[in-house]
């Protein structure tokens, strides 16, 4: 199976006297089937390539590195003053 199928979609809508929307024109469109194990990749694709989980991990890593460097610098400064 190639993952490509044709589906019918509504391309034009009209209002009914009862106030509902009804399909006026149908057309065939090509669609891609995505396997369930790829759901995480689809979320990233739909969000424009932005992953909140990855951002959280990256931000925590950068912040952790900054704090570590700050503490090492502070300790080095104290050791220099102690001499």
UniProtKB/Swiss-Prot annotation:
Protein name (database record): Uncharacterized protein ORF83
Keyword Membrane among UniProt keywords: yes
Transmembrane segments: 55-75
Record's GO cellular component terms: host cell membrane; membrane
Topology class, membrane: Single-pass membrane protein
Subcellular location: Host membrane
Function of the protein: May play a role in phage assembly.
Highest taxon of source: Viruses
Keywords of the record: Host membrane, Membrane, Transmembrane, Transmembrane helix
Main localisation: host cell
